[in-house]
Curated annotation (Swiss-Prot):
GO terms for molecular function: thymidylate synthase activity. It catalyses: dUMP + (6R)-5,10-methylene-5,6,7,8-tetrahydrofolate = 7,8-dihydrofolate + dTMP. InterPro entries: Thymidate_synth/dCMP_Mease (IPR045097), Thymidate_synth/dCMP_Mease_dom (IPR023451), Thymidate_synth/dCMP_Mease_sf (IPR036926), Thymidylate_synthase (IPR000398), Thymidylate_synthase_AS (IPR020940). Homodimer. Disulfide bonds: none annotated. It comes from Stutzerimonas stutzeri (strain A1501) (Pseudomonas stutzeri). One of its GO terms (cellular component) is cytosol. This is Thymidylate synthase.
């Protein structure tokens, strides 16, 4: 995961100090890209231990179209707790936009189901896109989508994915986002009878929070370790049928976890 450390180093060297919504302050650059060949291993950061359980459960939660944190809490995942209301609701966030984007005629659009159908029917399409950024509903969301749009691309029997992340919390958020969309790519590839290709991460406002600098500098002193392998249950051919038990991470070795505060 040298690519990730290079991003962190780039922001430490070239970032501009900016105020932000949380009042914490950030060091930020605009526009950055990282590429990960999924044949070389699963891109889970090794220079600090990452909580894969949270990544998998959150992705499954998105794919079910869920916007209440009940499922997450039942599975020991607390990453959305700070934004939920007293009933656990988050408003029309990722899962709602992915699976139930409201159409003008009162019906809803299942972007994920449409995406799968299009990959199978017309893999050369340039419209293999899912958007979570719905301007009409942004104000109703507990937190507007940071990872706002992703596109798939099929070539030579391989499926690649590019994510556009408008707001990138480099220390805490980005390692999760890379792993989550890399995993989604593996899952979609399996159910569409394709091989995984590349995951490409494109960031807009890429920032380190002012209270994450010490942690980032510590992480930059660590040498990346070999990437692990992610194994999926080969029997699963329906994207919405995947369960937590269908994933096995093999060979994950990482440096110790580095604690850092979340900016809310």
């Amino acid at each position: 995961m040298k690519q990730y450390l290079d991003l962190m180093r780039h922001v430490r060297e070239h970032g501009t100090f900016k105020s932000d919504r949380t009042g914490t302050g950030t060091y930020s650059v605009f526009g950055y890209q990282m590429r990960f060949d999924l044949a070389e291993g699963f891109p889970l950061v090794t220079t600090k231990k990452c909580h894969l359980k949270s990544i998998i459960h959150e992705l499954l939660w998105f794919l079910q179209g869920d916007t209440n944190i009940k499922y997450l809490k039942e599975n020991g995942v607390r990453i959305w707790d700070e934004w939920a209301d007293e009933n656990g609701e988050l408003g029309p966030v990722y899962g709602y936009q992915w699976r139930s984007w409201p159409a003008p005629n009162g019906e809803s659009i299942d972007q994920i189901a449409n995406l799968l159908a299009m990959i199978k029917k017309n893999p050369d399409s340039r419209r293999l896109i899912v958007s979570a950024w719905n301007p009409a509903l942004v104000e109703q969301m507990a937190l507007p989508p940071c990872h706002a749009l992703f596109q798939f691309y099929v070539a030579d029997g391989k499926l690649s994915c590019q994510l556009y992340q408008r707001s990138a919390d480099i220390f805490l958020g980005v390692p999760f986002n890379i792993a989550s969309y890399a995993l989604l790519t593996l899952m979609v590839a399996q159910v569409c009878d394709l091989e995984p290709g590349e995951f490409i991460w494109s960031g807009g406002d890429c920032h380190l929070y002012a209270n994450h600098l010490e942690q980032a500098d510590l992480q930059l002193t660590r040498e990346p370790l070999p990437l692990p392998t992610m194994k999926l249950n080969p029997e699963v051919k329906d994207l919405f049928a995947f369960r937590f038990e269908d994933f096995e991470l093999v060979g994950y070795e990482a440096h110790p976890h580095i604690k850092a505060p979340v900016a809310v």
